[in-house]
C-alpha cells in the first residue's frame, strides 16, 4: 500500500497548485522530485482597468523537492517557480517551504480518516507582484492549512479516495485570504489514475477594482474565483509518474476570468538509503 501511495504523495492534485494538499504522506526518508509545466490563458480581468488588449498567455515552470523525515508523521517540501507572461519574461516568480504533520492515518486501518495539518511560507519576487497573473498577495506570504481524506483499498493498492483541503493565510501587506479544494480520485488497472476536482480562492481586501497598470499584488483586492478540472495520471512503477490535468475558471470576481489551464507534471521518487 505505502509503495503505491508514495508515487503520488507529494505532487499536488490541482492545476496551478504545487505545494502538497493531500492528507497522505509518502515513505520515510524517501525523497520526491516534481517538475511541472503549466500553460494558462485568460481573456481579461473581471473589474480590471484598463482592459487587456489581448488575452494573457502565461507559462509556469515549477520544481519541488519533498521528503518524509525524522518521523513517518512529518514531511517537508521546498519549491521554486519560474514564470513567463506578457508582463514579465522568464524569471523567478516565487520560492516556498512547507512542513506538515499527520495526526490520523486511515491506511493501516487504525483511523477512520487521514488528517494532516501544515504551514508554509512563500517569498515572491518584486517584479512578479506587479503582474496580475501572479496569484499571491504580497512578497511574504504565510499560510496554515489542514487536509482530511479517506481511501478505499483493493488488494495491495487503493481503488479510490477523496479528500478536502482548506487553508488561511496572511501576507506582510494587505488582507487575509483563504482557499479550499475538494478532490476525487479513482485508481484503475494498477497504473492509471483519474481525478476530478474543484478549487476556490478568496481574498478579503477592501478594493473591488483591479488597477492592472499599477498592480501591487492581490492583498488589497476582494477577489473570488472557482475552478473545476480533471486529470489523468500514469504510474511507471520505479520511474515515477506522469500526469496531465486541465482546469477552467467558472467564477471570477475582481480576478482573471475565463482562465483555462493545462498542466503536465512528472514525479520521481528516490532514496539515498
Task: Please place each PLM-identified region on the residue numbering.
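Short glycine/proline- and aromatic-enriched beta-strand/turn motifs that initiate or cap beta-hairpins
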Residues: 17-68
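Short loop/turn motifs that connect adjacent beta-strands in outer-membrane beta-barrel proteins
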Residues: 19-29, 70-73, 87-89, 104-115, ...
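Residues on the lipid-exposed face of transmembrane beta-strands in outer-membrane beta-barrel proteins
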Residues: 33-35, 63-69, 97-101, 144-150, ...
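Membrane-embedded beta-strand positions of outer-membrane beta-barrel proteins
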Residues: 33-37, 76-78, 99, 115-119, ...
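Transmembrane beta-strands of outer-membrane beta-barrel pores
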Residues: 35-43, 69-73, 80-86, 103, ...
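Outer membrane beta-barrel transmembrane domains
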Residues: 42-52, 191-273
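Glycine- and aromatic-enriched membrane insertion/assembly motifs of diderm outer-membrane
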Residues: 53-98
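Outer-membrane pore/translocation modules
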Residues: 80-182, 214-220
Amino acid at each position: 500500500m505505502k509503495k503505491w501511495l508514495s508515487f503520488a504523495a507529494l505532487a499536488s492534485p490541482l492545476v496551478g497548485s504545487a505545494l502538497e494538499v493531500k492528507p497522505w504522506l509518502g515513505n520515510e526518508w524517501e525523497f520526491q522530485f516534481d517538475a511541472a509545466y503549466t500553460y494558462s490563458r485568460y481573456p481579461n480581468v473581471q473589474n480590471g482597468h484598463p482592459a487587456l488588449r489581448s488575452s494573457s498567455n502565461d507559462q509556469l515552470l515549477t520544481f519541488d523537492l519533498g521528503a518524509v523525515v525524522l518521523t513517518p508523521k512529518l514531511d517537508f517540501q521546498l519549491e521554486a517557480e519560474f514564470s513567463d507572461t506578457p508582463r514579465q519574461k522568464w524569471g523567478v516568480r516565487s520560492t516556498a517551504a512547507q512542513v506538515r504533520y499527520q495526526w490520523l492515518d486511515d491506511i493501516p486501518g487504525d483511523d477512520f480518516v487521514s488528517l494532516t495539518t501544515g504551514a508554509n511560507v512563500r517569498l515572491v519576487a518584486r517584479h512578479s507582484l506587479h503582474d496580475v497573473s501572479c496569484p499571491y498577495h504580497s512578497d511574504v506570504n504565510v499560510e496554515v492549512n489542514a487536509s482530511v481524506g479517506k481511501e478505499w483499498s483493493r488488494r495491495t493498492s487503493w481503488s479510490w479516495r477523496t479528500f478536502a483541503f482548506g487553508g488561511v493565510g496572511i501576507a506582510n501587506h494587505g488582507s487575509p485570504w483563504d482557499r479550499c479544494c475538494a478532490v476525487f480520485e479513482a485508481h484503475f488497472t494498477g497504473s492509471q489514475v483519474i481525478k476530478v476536482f474543484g478549487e476556490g480562492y478568496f481574498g478579503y481586501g477592501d478594493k473591488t477594482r483591479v488597477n492592472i497598470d499599477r498592480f501591487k499584488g492581490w492583498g488589497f483586492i476582494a477577489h473570488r474565483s472557482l475552478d473545476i478540472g480533471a486529470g489523468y495520471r500514469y504510474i511507471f512503477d520505479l520511474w515515477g509518474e506522469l500526469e496531465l490535468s486541465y482546469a477552467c475558471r467558472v467564477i471570477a470576481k475582481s480576478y482573471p476570468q475565463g482562465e483555462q489551464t493545462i498542466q503536465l507534471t512528472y514525479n520521481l521518487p528516490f532514496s539515498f538509503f
